[in-house]
Amino acid sequence: MDRHTPTPDNPWLALRNLTPARIALGRTGISLPTGAQLDFQYAHAQARDAVHLPFDHAGLRQQLSDRGRDSLLLHSAASDRHQYLQRPDLGRRLHEDSAQRLREHAQANPGGVDLAIVVADGLSALAVHRHTLPFLSRFEEQAAAEGWTSAPVVLVEQGRVAVADEVGELLGARMTVMLIGERPGLSSPDSLGLYFTYAPKVGLTDAYRNCISNVRLEGLSYGMAAHRLLYLMREACRRQLSGVNLKDEAEVHSIDSNNTGTKSGNFLLGEG
């Protein structure tokens, strides 16, 4: 007797070309096909590896130096990866030695800056390795054209989002943007998140931050992320706030679904 159970055709199969999401996986009897099971296990392994991948800060600093950008290497209060994962609060503050180094830098460079750019490994150093330099290339070119000033790029080992508040406060920056590896998903182990804050200081909650997420080749493009961040910077300085009271209403150009050309506006607000 032939015990082979064929995998039936799935009418949704064509939709898989439009999304990396796990849809139209098919079935063999009442189970998933072997290929889908193996793909899931592989994606799960990639996500776990992304969380534990060491932060190659030396390589990133060298790349920044090659582009003519100064950088500072700091460490959070979390001593290692294990403590970082177990104690999120320690990842939100700088180690005292790092905080003192920033104070000395600020004293040697008085006057403050418009923006402090902070880069932390977060939960995916892979995202930071892949996307930090390409994004900064697009963003800093446009920011310089608009006249914004910035401090040396600050790299924080074992850092979480809120550590940028302390960095910005110590540097006297009007604004901070944190580039951090987001929690890996099963289809996105390398998503970079941008967290923007106006008037940073220790103790701010997430309500005072704006998030631009999923910056990667398969997600939000570097150019669009830079466009949205610059919009937030301009509006934050004009209105002197950030977070839930500052909505992203940046105009974006998209292709009309009827192929009649381009249109502008925020599609989330039904404009254009």
Curated annotation (Swiss-Prot):
Keyword Lyase on entry: yes
Gene that encodes the chain: eutC
TM spans (from-to): none
One Gene Ontology MF term: cobalamin binding
Gene3D superfamilies membership: Ethanolamine ammonia-lyase light chain (EutC), Ethanolamine ammonia-lyase light chain (EutC), N-terminal domain
Keyword annotations from UniProtKB, A to Z: Bacterial microcompartment, Cobalamin, Cobalt, Lyase
Family: Belongs to the EutC family.
Keyword Lyase: yes
PANTHER family to which the protein is assigned, alphabetical: ETHANOLAMINE AMMONIA-LYASE LIGHT CHAIN, ETHANOLAMINE AMMONIA-LYASE SMALL SUBUNIT
Pathway(s) this gene product operates in, as recorded in its UniProt entry: Amine and polyamine degradation; ethanolamine degradation
Residues reported to bind adenosylcob(III)alamin: V161, E182, C211
Predominant location: other
Function: Catalyzes the deamination of various vicinal amino-alcohols to oxo compounds. Allows this organism to utilize ethanolamine as the sole source of nitrogen and carbon in the presence of external vitamin B12.
Cleavable signal peptide: none
GO cellular component terms listed in the entry, alphabetical order: ethanolamine ammonia-lyase complex; ethanolamine degradation polyhedral organelle
GO biological process, one term: ethanolamine catabolic process
Name of the protein in its database record: Ethanolamine ammonia-lyase small subunit
Assembly description: The basic unit is a heterodimer which dimerizes to form tetramers. The heterotetramers trimerize; 6 large subunits form a core ring with 6 small subunits projecting outwards.
Cellular location(s): Bacterial microcompartment
Cofactor: adenosylcob(III)alamin
Pfam families assigned to the protein according to its UniProt record, in alphabetical order: EutC (PF05985)
Record-listed E.C. numbers: 4.3.1.7
Catalysis performed (reactions): ethanolamine = acetaldehyde + NH4(+)
Cofactor details (free text): Binds between the large and small subunits.
UniProt lineage: Bacteria, Pseudomonadati, Pseudomonadota, Gammaproteobacteria, Pseudomonadales
Species this protein is from: Pseudomonas entomophila (strain L48)
InterPro entries, per database record: EutC, EutC_C, EutC_N
